[in-house]
Amino acid sequence: MNPTPQSGSTIIPCLRYRDAHAAIEWLCKAFGFTRHAVHEDGQGRVEHAQLAYGNGMVMLGEVRDNAFGQHIAQPDEIGGRETQCACVTVANCKSHYEQAKAAGAVIVDDYAEKEYGGAGYSCHDPEGHLWYFGSYDPWQPEQG
């Protein structure tokens, strides 16, 4: 099976937030995402949103008790842990780290140069989702 050709990433993380409007604002301010699309239901809750970063994207929406939502736990429901982490490649990791820290990101793995190349750090957003940002580009051929 081959992926459908497209202009962006073929793998797009999807997250749920209790307050998706606040999450969108914070993710744009702290991490530099831009709104690609935000769709609300009849009560003004975020049904589906797309936030872009470079040629990548995350999708998000409000926590819901539907067939899909019943398979997703929020970090605070499972002791602050995650089973997955969104990894984002950034051009200037040090300045991205400083921006995220200034916006209140909870740093869980401090900024550091990595032995395998590049630099990176990990943090939690206000609802506890784990993120990794780094300058290492896994698509680049290995130097050797």
How would you describe each model-predicted region?
Residues 1-14, 24-25, 31-126, 134-144:
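Vicinal oxygen chelate
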